[in-house]
From Swiss-Prot:
Chief location bin: secreted
Function: Selective antagonist of neuronal tetrodotoxin (TTX)-sensitive voltage-gated sodium channels (IC(50)=1270 nM on Nav1.1/SCN1A, 270 nM on Nav1.2/SCN2A, 491 nM on Nav1.3/SCN3A and 232 nM on Nav1.7/SCN9A). This toxin suppress Nav1.7 current amplitude without significantly altering the activation, inactivation, and repriming kinetics. Short extreme depolarizations partially activate the toxin-bound channel, indicating voltage-dependent inhibition of this toxin. This toxin increases the deactivation of the Nav1.7 current after extreme depolarizations.
Cystine pairs: 50-65, 57-70, 64-77
Protein name: Hainantoxin-III 10
Tissue: Expressed by the venom gland.
Similarity field: Belongs to the neurotoxin 10 (Hwtx-1) family. 15 (Hntx-3) subfamily.
Swiss-Prot/TrEMBL keywords: Amidation, Disulfide bond, Ion channel impairing toxin, Knottin, Neurotoxin, Presynaptic neurotoxin, Secreted, Signal, Toxin, Voltage-gated sodium channel impairing toxin
């Protein structure tokens, strides 16, 4: 009788410890995932030499990427329609 009570108690303790350990791992998972997603140092993008759609520009300097033109009225890169 004492042995069965001891085994039952040991089983409950083990179940509690395993549950607590898995729960703490689950709490760390979102932090690890976010740190991997926002790790910008590993995947630094190349800087473009030209400016894309909506970027501010100076008219006449040809700073916009191909197929874009600097609008003299708004002073930002727009799609060049070839007028």
């Amino acid at each position: 009788m004492k042995a069965s009570m001891f085994l039952a108690l040991a089983g409950l303790v083990r179940l509690f410890v395993v549950g607590y350990a898995s729960e703490s791992e689950e709490k760390e998972f979102p932090r690890e995932l976010l740190s991997k997603i926002f790790a910008v140092d590993d995947f630094k993008g190349e800087e473009r030499g030209c400016k894309g759609f909506g970027d501010s520009c100076t008219p006449g300097k040809n700073e916009c990427c191909p197929n874009y033109a600097c609008s003299s009225k708004h002073k930002w890169c727009k799609v060049y329609l070839g007028k």
